[in-house]
Amino acid sequence: MRIRTGQILSAVTLWALTGVITSTLPAISIAQSPAKVDSRFEAARSAIRQAMEEKQIPSVSVAVAKDGKIIWEESFGWADREKMIRATPDTLYSLASISKPFTATALMRLVQQGKIDLDKPANDYLGAVKLTGLAGDASAATVRRVLSHTAGLPYHYHFFYNNEADGPPGMDESIAHYGLVVTPPGEAWEYSNLGYGIIDYIIARTSGRDYADYMRTEVFVPLGLTHTSVDIGPGLESYAAQRYDAQQRPIPFYTFDHRGGSAIYASAHDLVRFGMFHLKDHLQYQQAILKDSTLDQMHQSATPPVPSQPGLGYGLGWITKADDHGYSAVYHTGGMPGVSTALALFPSEDLAVVVLTNSYAGITPKMMQAIVGCVLPKYADAVRNDKEQNPPKPGPFTPNPQLLGAWTGTVRTWKDKMTFSIVFQQDADIHVKLGEQLETLVNDASFRDGALEGRFVSSITTPDVNRYGHTLLLHLRLRGDKLTGQVIAETPDDSVHYALASYAELIRKTDAK
C-alpha cells in the first residue's frame, strides 16, 4: 500500500519487508506509565491504546511541548518484542523523512558561515559528477530548490538490507545515474529523497567531514540531543527500536543512498526538544546554532502553489500548511518499512507534538490529530467537522481532451534509450508500449495539477533495476505538444527496495486519428 499526499511525488510512505519472528512473542503491552499524566491527554492515550490493539503496533512513543516546557512524554508497548525491551521516551526510533529537517538545519549552519550560497547551483558544490539537465537547465537547480523539492529532481528511494549482498553505491554513482533534472527547476514541488542525499553529500564535501560526524558535532551535541544519531550510533544499540513489518516480523537493518533524507534515529524526548529549538524555545543547555531569522526562513514556503492542496507548501526541510484546522503548522512526517513518524509545530501556539512508531500502520496522522486536539480544542472541533462533511471521493479517470490521441518518444535510462508510445482513447483507456515489450494498459490513472499519473506492467532493463521485480509508474506533465517527466521502476510493497526514475519525453503524433 502506498499513501500519497496529493501528487504521487508529494510524499513517500512505504510498507514493510518480510522477516522472521518466533511464535512466542509477548502481547502488545503498555510501557510503564509516568506517575502523573495531564488529564487533558486521557482521550489521546485511549486512542493510542485502541490503535495499537487494532493494528498490532509494537510500540508508540509520544511527546508534547507547550510554551517552552515538555508537558507530556510517554511510551507504550515494546521497542523490541523478541528481547522484551519496553519502549521509553529515550528509545531511538528510525525517523524516515523527519531526517530532512535535521539535515536542512545542518546545511543552514554552513549557509550562516558563508560557506554555501542557497541561490547558487547545487552543481557548484558537487565533484566531477554533476546533475544532468534534461527538462531544464541544471544550473537552475539551486541549493535552495534542492532543499524545497523544487529543483526538478526525480522521485527516488533506494534501500539496501543487511541480509542481502548489495550495498549503497557511492553518491557520485547515484548522481550519475539518477541526478536528472526531469522537471524545469522552480516549476513544481516534486518530492525527491535523492535531493536530500545530494544535500548530505554537499554538507560532507563543504565541511570536509563525514555527514554523520558533522551532524553529531554541529547539530546533535550542541542541541543536547544525546539519543539522536545518523543510523544507530556507537553505544546507542541497546536503545534502538526494532523495525517490524505488517505481519509483526522484524525487518533486517537497512540503509540508503539518501542518508540525509532518511537515516536519522531519535528518541521522542530528543525530537520534541529539536522541535522546541525550531519554535525558538532555546533551552538553557542548547547552543543557538541558527539565528532566529534563519529558523523563520526555513519555515516559509518556497514552493509554487499546488492547486489541489491550497495552503500546502515546503520550506527548507519542513512542510508548511497555512491552515491546518484553523492553525498555521510547520511539520514533517516519515514513512518507510517499519516506520511511521510525525513531528508537528504550531508556532502561534508555541506547541510541538511528536509521534513515533516502529511499524507502518498508516494511523500516525490520526494519533497526531488526537494529541493536538487535546491541547487545542478548536483544532479538535475542526477535525470533527471535517469527518462529518465526508468529502466526495475522486471519480473515474476522464482523459483531458488535450491528451487524446497517440504520442511517441523515448525513455532515457542511465544505460540506454527505449522507444515509448502512449495512446489515450476516448473511453479513458491508456495504452502504452515500452521498447519491444508487449503493449499494456495504464492502471490507476489520474490527471491533476497538470500531471498525468498511473501504473503499468513493463520493465526497465538497467542492472540495478533488474535485481527485483517491479512495475512502472508514470509521472508526466503536458507542455503543449510534449509530454515530459518520469517513468519510475518501483518494487512491490512486500519487497520494498527502490523507486528509480528514468526521463521520458514524448511528442504528439500529428497523423493520429
Predicted regions and their residues:
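Active-site SXXK
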Residues: 42-48, 62, 68, 92-122, ...
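Central antiparallel beta-sheet cores of small beta-barrel/beta-sandwich binding domains
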Residues: 408-473, 498
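Bacterial N-terminal signal peptides
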Residues: 10-26
